[in-house]
């Protein structure tokens, strides 16, 4: 059974990492970021659910009989 030739693995891995780095740098450099980011205020709207206006009884668990 022949041995696996690993002599070219190093250059392949290094070139792949370098290519990925360059591609990601090019993708990131095309993004335009705002120079002065501002906080966007959002209004909280209250959604009323039908069960909020009704009184509901909360049942406590059954207690053990007194001994």
From Swiss-Prot:
Indicate where this protein resides in the cell.
Answer: Mitochondrion membrane
GO terms (BP aspect): proton motive force-driven ATP synthesis
Q: Which InterPro entries match?
A: ATP8_mammal (IPR039017), ATP8_metazoa (IPR001421)
Give the UniProt entry's GO cellular component terms.
mitochondrial membrane; proton-transporting ATP synthase complex
Look up keyword Mitochondrion and say if it applies.
yes
Report the transmembrane regions from the record: 8-24
Locate the N6-succinyllysine modifications and list their residues.
Answer: 54
Gene Ontology terms for molecular function: proton transmembrane transporter activity
Give the domain of life: Eukaryota
Q: Please provide an example of a Pfam family that matches this protein in its UniProt record.
A: ATP-synt_8
Classify the protein's membrane topology as the record does: Single-pass membrane protein
Keyword match Transmembrane helix: yes
UniProtKB keywords: Acetylation, ATP synthesis, CF(0), Hydrogen ion transport, Ion transport, Membrane, Mitochondrion, Transmembrane, Transmembrane helix, Transport
Task: Give the primary localization class.
Answer: mitochondrion
Q: Which positions does the record annotate as the modified residue N6-acetyllysine? A: 54, 57
- What task does this protein carry out? Subunit 8, of the mitochondrial membrane ATP synthase complex (F(1)F(0) ATP synthase or Complex V) that produces ATP from ADP in the presence of a proton gradient across the membrane which is generated by electron transport complexes of the respiratory chain. ATP synthase complex consist of a soluble F(1) head domain - the catalytic core - and a membrane F(1) domain - the membrane proton channel. These two domains are linked by a central stalk rotating inside the F(1) region and a stationary peripheral stalk.
Q: Which family does it belong to?
A: Belongs to the ATPase protein 8 family.
The subunit structure is:
Component of the ATP synthase complex composed at least of ATP5F1A/subunit alpha, ATP5F1B/subunit beta, ATP5MC1/subunit c (homooctomer), MT-ATP6/subunit a, MT-ATP8/subunit 8, ATP5ME/subunit e, ATP5MF/subunit f, ATP5MG/subunit g, ATP5MK/subunit k, ATP5MJ/subunit j, ATP5F1C/subunit gamma, ATP5F1D/subunit delta, ATP5F1E/subunit epsilon, ATP5PF/subunit F6, ATP5PB/subunit b, ATP5PD/subunit d, ATP5PO/subunit OSCP.
Q: What is this protein's record name? A: ATP synthase F(0) complex subunit 8
Organism, by scientific name, is Equus caballus
What is the gene name? Answer: MT-ATP8
């Amino acid at each position: 059974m022949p041995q696996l030739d690993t002599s070219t693995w190093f250059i392949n891995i290094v070139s792949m990492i370098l290519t990925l780095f360059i591609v990601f740098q090019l993708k990131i450099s095309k993004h335009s970021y705002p120079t002065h980011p501002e906080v966007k205020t959002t209004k909280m709207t209250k959604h009323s659910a039908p069960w909020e206006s009704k009184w509901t009884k909360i049942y406590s668990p059954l207690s053990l009989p007194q001994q």
